[in-house]
Amino acid sequence: LSLGACGNSNGDVAAESTAAATTEAATTEAATTEAAATEASTEAAEAVADEKSEGVMTYEEYMAADLDSEVVIEAYVQAKQSWWEDKATLYTQDQDGAYFIYNSVCSEEDYAKLVPGTKIKVTGYKTEWSGEVEIAEGATFEIEEGSYIAPVTDVTDLLGTDDLINYQNQFVAFKGMTVEASQDATGNDVAFLYNYDGSGEDGNDLYFNVSLNGQTYTFTVESYLCDNTTDVYNAVKNLKIGDTIDMEGFLYWYEGVNPHITSVTVK
């Protein structure tokens, strides 16, 4: 508003300007204090989230442990793949890395408690299967206090590099990739396959090829993790060769990178 419209004298304007400046300074200071408090709170929460109990390995110690040796880790459930006959397969992560837990001992009652963010302490044996480092079948766990959801990490630029495996099993993103043709059982070009060889049907795993910078990779929708009622399953079924897509999922490994995709967006 103009000064005339306000109907104030110069003295009133000066007083009002001083008051406004004081108020603005106080507001700015309060906002700065609040931001600092929020940051401190976040850092404290992250420190708590990353603090290990006595006898529990850090992620670095876990990765350095020999295959087939006993490991004890603490991590936070990010997703559940499946439960069957008191066995649960879990995607878990902490501040430093991720742990794939295959067929751990788990009652149906406990499985229901494992919502995303739940902290668990796992005791089992480290193993490797076709390049995938995991905690082997038969591990046990106990639920602990604490919660943490890992942020997504964009690893698009790491595709085709030796560094990518350092993010194995983490929740990651791939951006701007192109859908490439797969060949079905009759030799036709298709955007996806049911099972790796096209032998499956609706409800089975989906396999699809995507490329970046001239290199093609095979990604998967794991049907136990994301079944045929999920958005991602149906999004992949509707892909077209040549589509440009962004994706999120877990950086699984099988004879090379083979992510388990949980989200697809066509650009």
List where the protein language model places each region.
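C-terminal motif of bacterial Sec signal peptides marking the signal peptidase cleavage site
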Residues: S2-A5
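OB-fold single-stranded nucleic acid-binding module
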Residues: E46-K267
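Short, low-complexity, disordered segments immediately C-terminal to signal peptides
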Residues: G7-T28
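Long, intrinsically disordered low-complexity tandem-repeat segments
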Residues: A21-T38, T42
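Intrinsically disordered, low-complexity repeat tracts enriched in Pro/Ser/Thr
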Residues: E16-A19, A37, S41, A47-D50
